[in-house]
Structure formats: structure tokens, C-alpha cells
Amino acid sequence: MADSRRVIIASWYRTFMGIVNLFGLETKTCWNVTRIEPLNEVQSCEGLRDPACFYVGVIFILNGLMMGLFFIYGTYLSGTELGGLITVLCFFFNHGEATCVMWTPPLRESFSYPFLVLQMYVLTLILRTSSNDRRPFIALCLSNVAFMLPWQFAQFILFTQIASLFPMYVVGYIEPSKFQKIIYMNMISVTLSFILMFGNSMYLSSYYSSSLLMTWAIILKRNEIQKLGVSKLNCWLIQGSAWWCGTIILKFLTSKILGVSDHICLSDLIAAGILRYTDFDTLKYTCSPEFDFMEKATLLIYTKTLLLPVVMVITCFIFKKTVGDISRVLATNVYLRCCLCRCHAYNGKCQAVYTSSHCESSTLRRCRLEAWLQHA
């Protein structure tokens, strides 16, 4: 999974070497290190001409550019430069918990992380604008590919992203046409990653790919689901249940058909953390504290930097607004189902289709009046 990262950086290294050789620039310094006999002297080098230094340098450059991207992202979300500055400061204050690039720069996630931030910014841009411009969608596809190629766990992060966007689509926060384009771009990015990884079947048998296929199917059957005649809440529950069950079933079916066995399964890591299940692969990951349960010191650090309190306050506001919006939609839907009547012009009469003892007579009278005015 990491070969693509090395291939890309190797191509950049050869391009860089061609440029510095063309201009005769000296970007490498070497010296001999004397060691105690019987060990011989060894040469040690630093500078961008050295492949190892170039590799680490590229990682640090990408993460440096990410700071500028955080500023742009925060400015766009808040509408002011102050918001971008606060975003960067919050990242600095929580730098030790947000990334490990300063300790282990060669890690695959250190290379992918900047592209994830770019992907989130592009996705936010798409969700907040109503333009039909294709360039943001193309940028979303390319940033997805750049994020997935170096890191095998990127698909799980994108899966959680789709799992967050799908309920927003179901309850009506995202336009169906826009959400359909987002799903198409994600499907194209999976296909491109599959091709660029020389046919790695893990991309096609992941939860991410299965969720995309299920989302696409539910979007196509949206009208049929709405014609079932059920309430709004039941319609949401049907789509949500179909998405979850279909994603899990499709994931296991594609794994069986393609004969793919993940070298490390997310369910194994969860079982290792909760049930203390162990094997060679889980021990390889869980020996690191990053994959263990959150320590109490971590919560204390988040509180000292005000990250945890601010996130909790924002989460409460979002939850309150979401519950209020959903309650209003459900209340309106129940009222309409109770009082809706189908009016047709036949001697100026109105035939009630959905009525009950709870319907207001004024609503039925208004329906008859509107029918009479239309066909008078």
C-alpha cells in the first residue's frame, strides 16, 4: 500500500536532481565519521540530494503547507481572517495530539494528512455553494486519490465521512443532485486508486466502497421509497437501516468474491481493545499507546488547551439545532398527512383522502375553497 508514496516521491526526487544538476547547485554535505576499531569509517550526508533527507523534507514541506491550508479553511468557515488565525493557533496548542510528524515523519499518515485537510476543505466548499462548477468536484476526486494512495487506513476515514453525509442527505440538509455528484466523485476516486495500485482488490472490498454502492442504490430508489406511503420518520429509518445492513453485507460478499483477506481488520482492533482478543497483527498495532484506550492525561491536555470544552459547546449547539429542525419537519409531515386532501373539480366538491378525527375543519374548508377558486 505504501509503494505509491515511494514512487511519487522518487519521481519528485529525480525531477529535483535534474534541476539542481542543470544549474550546478550544491545541496548535499558529507563527512566521514570515525568509529572505534575494528569498525571502519562511514560517510554521513545531509541535504536534499540525499534520498533519506529528501524524503523527510517532502513530508515536512507538505505539513508546513498544511498550516496555510488550515488558515484558509478556518477563514472560509468563519468568514474572517481571525477565524483562520484561531484555527492555526488551536492546531499549534494541540500539536502533540493532532499529529506525530515531528517524531516519526516517514509514517504513511504523515504524508496523507495534508491531503485529508485539503479534501475536507473542498468538500465544505461544495456543500456550502450552489454553483454548478465542475472544478470543485474534480478537486474532490483528486484529493481523495492523493489521500488514499499512501495510507491503507484512509478508506476507514472516508467511510466515516460518507456515514456522516448520508444522514444529512436523508433528512434534507444536502440536495439530492449535489450528494449524487459527491458519491460519483468518490466512486471515481476509488476506481483510480484501484488502477494506480495495480489492481489492489482491497479498495473494492472495503467498507468505503460498499457504502458508496449502497448510497448510490438508495439515491436511485429514492422516489420508490417515498411512494411507500409511510411517515417521514419511517422513511428515514428505512433508508438508514438499508444503508447499514447493505454496507456490511456487501462488504463481506465482495471480500468473499474477490478473495480478499485484510492484513489487519478494523473489527479485530476493536475486539482487541474491548475483548482483549490478540493475534500477531493486533499485537503489532496495539503495542503502541496510540491504538490503546484513551488515557486520562489526554483528556486533561484537551481541557487545558480549551479544545474539549469548545468542542462540547459546539456539539451541543449543533445537536440542539438538528433536533429542532428534525422535530419541525416531522411535525409538519404529520400535520399534512392528517389534513391533506385531494381536490378535484366535480360540481365544486372536494374529496378528502387523508383525514382523521384530529384534522381541523378550517383546513378542509380552505382546501375546498382553493379547489373552487381553481376550477370556478
Curated annotation (Swiss-Prot):
Protein topology in the membrane: Multi-pass membrane protein
Organism domain of life: Eukaryota
Any Gene Ontology CC annotation: nuclear inner membrane
Residues carrying sugar: 32
An annotated Gene Ontology molecular function: mannosyltransferase activity
Pfam annotation, one family: Dpy19
Keywords of the record: Glycoprotein, Glycosyltransferase, Membrane, Transferase, Transmembrane, Transmembrane helix
One GO-annotated biological process of the protein: spermatid development
Subcellular location(s) of the protein: Membrane
Chief localization: membrane
Function: Probable C-mannosyltransferase that mediates C-mannosylation of tryptophan residues on target proteins.
Protein name per Swiss-Prot or TrEMBL: Putative C-mannosyltransferase DPY19L2P2
Organism from which the protein derives: Homo sapiens
Lineage per the UniProt record: Eukaryota, Metazoa, Chordata, Craniata, Vertebrata
